[in-house]
């Protein structure tokens, strides 16, 4: 049964930039909003100096009040465990500095590359593998974008541009229109892929102007949402996805397997069901990238495979995402089938 988007009733008409501006950045305010005692999080609050906190109201609305183990809360609340210096964890686990060919470009793969349109995000996820990335060396402005466009134009093997970040939808619609127009003028480009978490934390970001932009481009357009738990999907998000479906955007999702958040086959099965009900196909289930500050989210490979095999037994094959790990320097992601 499909999730039939209802007429949104909460903040749907509110400008997404206003919601973004009002995002909570003080852990104490987040705890207060969720009816959680500040005294229980004294050490965790200190971890904000390692990686700032940022959570917009639409995402906070999905978190269960009074529950310190809520899976959405655990993804965004700073933790004293981030101070742990775990073996094998680093500030650049994918060695992306080696692929930073020119500002705003990560050229890891043969026929596609990542275009770092914007460095900021609407929400700071504590497991983010780019939490230490040098965004100041990759400014999201037209001057640096032009250097990136020149690089793409000079590499005829590039068929697909992947908007990444940060979050590329932090760019305003007129900025995205400028970028897409210039990409369309590069004849060897066929596809535009947009990786984003913004629609699930601020669904209002999917504006009519943005949808029109994607409807009119000659490039085949794919959006990959970043959703880890079924509780992140609500009717307002479903409405936003309906707008994208209406303009023939291919919708996929990737998740990260996170201890305490979604390390359960039944939860992943429900996630796949809800994604499909909103017109999104499960794409990747990533093993954690070993970024410094996120070791408390790590699940062993053995446990991950057990969860994955159980998931395969619970649902249809097309609803099972590919279990994958990105290994620095490899020409593609490494898949784990059995």
From Swiss-Prot:
Residues binding [4Fe-4S] cluster, per UniProt: 121, 125, 128
Xref: InterPro entries: Aldolase_TIM, EpmB, Lys_aminomutase/Glu_NH3_mut, rSAM
Cofactor: [4Fe-4S] cluster; pyridoxal 5'-phosphate
Enzyme class: isomerase
Catalytic reaction equation(s): L-lysine = D-beta-lysine
The protein's Enzyme Commission number: 5.4.3.-
Electron transport among keywords: no
Modification type N6-(pyridoxal phosphate)lysine: residues: 333
Keywords, alphabetical: 4Fe-4S, Iron, Iron-sulfur, Isomerase, Metal-binding, Pyridoxal phosphate, S-adenosyl-L-methionine
Reported function: With EpmA is involved in the beta-lysylation step of the post-translational modification of translation elongation factor P (EF-P) on 'Lys-34'. EpmB appears to act before EpmA. Displays lysine 2,3-aminomutase activity, producing (R)-beta-lysine from (S)-alpha-lysine (L-lysine).
Similarity section: Belongs to the radical SAM superfamily. KamA family.
Protein name as annotated: L-lysine 2,3-aminomutase
Gene: epmB
């Amino acid at each position: 049964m499909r999730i039939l988007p209802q007429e949104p009733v909460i903040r749907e008409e509110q400008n997404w930039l206003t919601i973004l501006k009002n995002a909570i950045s003080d852990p104490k305010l987040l705890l207060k909003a969720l009816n959680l005692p500040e005294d229980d999080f004294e050490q965790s609050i200190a971890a904000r100096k390692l990686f700032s906190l940022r959570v917009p109201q639409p995402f906070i609305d999905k978190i269960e009040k009074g529950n310190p183990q809520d899976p959405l809360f655990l993804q965004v609340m700073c933790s004293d465990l981030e101070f742990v210096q775990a073996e094998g964890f680093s500030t650049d686990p994918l060695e992306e500095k080696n692929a930073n060919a020119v500002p705003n470009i990560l050229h890891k793969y043969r026929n596609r590359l990542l275009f770092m349109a914007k460095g900021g995000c609407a929400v700071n996820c504590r497991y983010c593998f780019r939490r230490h990335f040098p965004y100041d060396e990759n400014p999201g402005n037209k001057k640096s974008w032009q250097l990136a466009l020149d690089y793409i134009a000079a590499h005829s093997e590039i068929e697909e541009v992947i908007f990444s970040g940060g979050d590329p939808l932090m760019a305003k619609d007129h900025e995205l229109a400028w970028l897409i127009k210039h990409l369309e003028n590069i004849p060897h480009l066929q596809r535009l892929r947009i990786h984003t978490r913004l629609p699930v934390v601020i669904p209002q970001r999917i504006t009519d102007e943005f949808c029109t932009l994607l409807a009119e481009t000659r490039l085949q357009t794919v959006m990959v949402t970043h959703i880890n738990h079924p509780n992140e999907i609500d009717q307002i998000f479903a409405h936003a996805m309906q707008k994208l479906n209406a303009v023939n955007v291919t919708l996929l999702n990737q998740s990260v397997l996170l201890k305490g958040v979604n390390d359960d086959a039944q939860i992943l099965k429900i996630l796949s069901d809800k994604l499909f009900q909103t017109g999104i196909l499960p794409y990747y289930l990533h093993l954690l990238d070993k970024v410094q500050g996120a070791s408390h989210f790590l699940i062993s490979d053995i446990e991950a495979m057990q969860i994955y095999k159980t998931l395969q037994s619970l649902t249809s094959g097309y609803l099972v995402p590919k279990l994958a790990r990105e290994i620095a320097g490899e020409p593609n992601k490494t898949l784990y089938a059995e």
